[in-house]
Amino acid sequence: MAIKKKRAGKAKTTKGYFSKYPKISYEGPKSKNPWAFKWYNPEEVIEGKTMAEHLRFSVVYWHTFRATGADQFGMGTMLRPWDDGSDSIANAQKRMRVAFEFMEKLGNPFWAFHDRDIAPEGKTLKETNKNLDAVLKVAKEEMDRTGIQLLWTTCNLFGNPRFMHGAATSCNADVFAFAADKVKKGLETALKLNAGGFTFWGGREGYTTLLNTDMKRELEHLGRFFKMAVAYKKEIGFDGQFYIEPKPKEPTKHQYDSDAAACLNFLRQFGLLKDFKLNLETNHAILAGHTMHHEMETAAAAGALGSLDANTGDPMLGWDTDQFPSSLYETANIMYTLLKYGGFTKGGVNFDAHVRRESFTPEDLFFAHIGGMDVFARGLKVAAAMRKDKALSEFIKKRYASWDSGIGAEIEKGKVGFKELEAYMLKKGNPAANESGRQEYLENIINDYIM
């Protein structure tokens, strides 16, 4: 899905809520303008592609336009003058137009949403779908007007009390059926809006206690659910990418999609690896006890590195803080790994992050995204420079040189077994001496490029 050029057209917003703010543009590293990019130059070419093509930035609807700042200890704080707080269709449609006004100013080429982010739930499934269609009409108009595309969409299968025991893994078969209808509608929505993908996140697919759980049966139901989704995707001709997004916990104590390895194991078990890739999130990796680098390498080794949810977490806290990324060391490693494995096809850098409760003004939405886009752009430049100089790859190549010839090559080709290896070592006597892993030396190299 190539990035579309912006189209001329007048927004239908009744009041320009962002008209007093400038369109965000690139001014370079020396700029002190908080309303400008210092590193993200969408037209700059790196490794044969523009920054915009490499990064494929996406704004999420849920955190950016639905987060109120409320938490378990206090009410909402966000100032959103365009939102009257009602669940009316008129308010939902207005909110959608305002969202595209914001994205036009920011300059991101993609966006993403859950079904319930954009339209309220009705009293019946029929009414719910009607509400969604009414807002999708506005979304389609705005996408056509601006050229902003849908990176991926998804369904909220965790918020309503009906999903307390799960959706596809619920002990209630009717809830499974209800979830299936939601995903059916979601896939039809993805097709209608030409989405690049569709994401499954199992926030309630797991357990709180094993005392009341038939794990084997639940996993089999989840596998069957995904096979139904694959079948319907083919039936309607949707050619977007399916993603699973790993997360170990929150809201459920243990989620079945706990990390990249667990997701890959599940996909292999049910013969679905060819149909899915992973949408990896930094904060979820942290909660799973991993780095994002680890999760990306795990997915990429299986050919399943699909898309990225860009955020970060607070290592001092044990929950999903969904902060905007700000660490150059982190983004440099992320972009190095992404470039190493060929970059995105239909995925992108999706800002699944929200401003802090204390950052409550509309201006903060801009500052957060500008910072996130800049730190990823600079991470891309650092990664490309390291690749050009082969700063890490040459060291790794030499480190594994014993596998390129001799007994190492014989092992990799499957030409020897235990008996042959025993004979080899009896003749040689002792293994060749090990060499230093040089971790500190390599960390210094990365810091040299960053600084």
Predicted features and spans:
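Active-site acidic/histidine proton-transfer and metal-coordination neighborhood
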Residues: 10-13, 43-46, 94-101, 109-110, ...
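Non-cysteine beta-strand/loop elements that form the S-adenosyl-L-methionine
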Residues: 58-62, 150-156, 199-201, 302-313, ...
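Gly/Pro-rich active-site loop or hairpin
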Residues: 69-94, 213-219, 253-264, 286-374
